[in-house]
């Protein structure tokens, strides 16, 4: 399936692009958001894109635009990337699209999906870290169950984990379809239009790539890289991601909440308020969902950096 960028116009509109501004696309993917940002930048504008997927980086390196630079690595290193370029506190907008791109899902060799059989890998960067198959080969049954329950909200986590550990003695799980078929056997299929393995595959992908930790670290880093008035736009694809983003923005809006009785003034509290939420959460229109079913769970949140 061709990759269709989700909430494309809405996310870029949320950045309130200035032609001479400095912007960061923290998740280049196949370049949908970056392309639209560049269209709105003037000759003095700059766009830095980040991705740890070698295939995405290869696509970006083909772009011939002096205003654009691709950075290879995890977006959680945002602070370091901008510090190296002397851009701390100077970025006018940061965009994070937390979804897995369609090429990643559709390419069987990447091991993200059970729709096509492939090696059980799931790494965003296949050159580093431990694959899903490698982890399942040695992980404790309780650890596997915790990952499935916490990151996939899987009700039958214990049952699946026990089956994995029992089977791996003679037949380790190394293929996507092999794992999906086992899950389909042990989990009741009560959700229409959703494969029983969907939640488990999400959980394993999040664990293998440390996705939630990456998001938390990047959101914290946004405070040091954004200029006063700079925008943060984040597209989430499931409740775990969106909860982190929503709570982060809410916490930064409130600032410190001292225990009652401490002699802290309203002005002192105001100085710790770093973000202001811009509008309400945005979901894709029905027309977008009908054109791209993978957009149905997406949510966009936008916030503005205070200060100045």
Curated annotation (Swiss-Prot):
A biological-process GO annotation: rRNA base methylation
Binding sites annotated in the UniProt record for S-adenosyl-L-methionine: 31-33, 51, 75, 97, 104
Known EC number: 2.1.1.199
Gene3D superfamilies, alphabetized: Putative methyltransferase TM0872, insert domain, Vaccinia Virus protein VP39
Repressor listed as a keyword: no
Top EC class, one word: transferase
Catalytic activity as recorded in UniProt: cytidine(1402) in 16S rRNA + S-adenosyl-L-methionine = N(4)-methylcytidine(1402) in 16S rRNA + S-adenosyl-L-homocysteine + H(+)
InterPro entries xrefs: RsmH, SAM-dep_MeTrfase_MraW_recog, SAM-dependent_MTases_sf
Highest taxon of the lineage: Bacteria
Cellular component terms per the entry's GO annotation: cytoplasm
Subcellular compartments: Cytoplasm
Family annotation (Pfam families): Methyltransf_5 (PF01795)
UniProt-recorded Gene Ontology molecular function terms: rRNA (cytosine-N4-)-methyltransferase activity
Entry keywords, A to Z: Cytoplasm, Methyltransferase, rRNA processing, S-adenosyl-L-methionine, Transferase
Keyword S-adenosyl-L-methionine: yes
Biological function: Specifically methylates the N4 position of cytidine in position 1402 (C1402) of 16S rRNA.
HAMAP family in UniProt: 16SrRNA_methyltr_H
Family label: Belongs to the methyltransferase superfamily. RsmH family.
Entry protein name: Ribosomal RNA small subunit methyltransferase H
């Amino acid at each position: 399936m061709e990759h269709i960028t989700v909430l494309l116009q809405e996310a870029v509109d949320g950045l309130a692009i200035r032609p001479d501004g400095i912007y960061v696309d923290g998740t280049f993917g196949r370049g949908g958001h970056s392309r639209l940002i560049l269209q709105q930048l003037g000759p003095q504008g700059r766009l830095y894109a980040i991705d740890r997927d070698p295939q995405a980086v290869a696509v970006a390196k083909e772009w011939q635009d002096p205003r654009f630079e691709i950075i290879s690595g995890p977006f959680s290193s945002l602070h370091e990337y901008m510090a190296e370029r002397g851009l701390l506190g100077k970025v006018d907008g940061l965009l994070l699209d937390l979804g897995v791109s369609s090429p990643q899902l559709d390419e069987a060799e990447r091991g993200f999906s059970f729709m096509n059989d492939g090696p059980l890998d799931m790494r965003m960067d296949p050159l580093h870290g431990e694959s899903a198959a490698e982890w399942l080969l040695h992980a404790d049954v309780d650890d596997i169950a915790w990952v499935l329950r916490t990151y996939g909200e899987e009700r039958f986590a214990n049952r699946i984990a026990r089956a994995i550990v029992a089977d791996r003695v003679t037949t380790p799980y190394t293929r996507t379809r092999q794992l999906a078929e086992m899950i389909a056997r042990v989990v009741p299929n009560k959700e229409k239009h959703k494969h029983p393995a969907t939640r488990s595959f999400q959980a394993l992908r999040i664990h293998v790539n440390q996705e939630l930790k990456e998001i938390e670290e990047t959101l914290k880093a946004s405070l040091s890289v954004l200029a006063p008035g700079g925008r943060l736009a984040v597209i989430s694809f499931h409740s775990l991601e969106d909860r982190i983003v929503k709570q982060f923005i809410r916490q930064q809006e409130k600032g410190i909440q001292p225990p009652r009785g401490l002699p802290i003034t309203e002005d002192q509290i105001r100085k710790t308020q770093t973000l202001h939420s811009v509008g309400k959460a945005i979901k894709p229109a029905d027309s977008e969902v009908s054109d791209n079913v993978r957009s149905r769970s997406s949510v966009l949140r936008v916030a503005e950096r205070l200060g100045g």
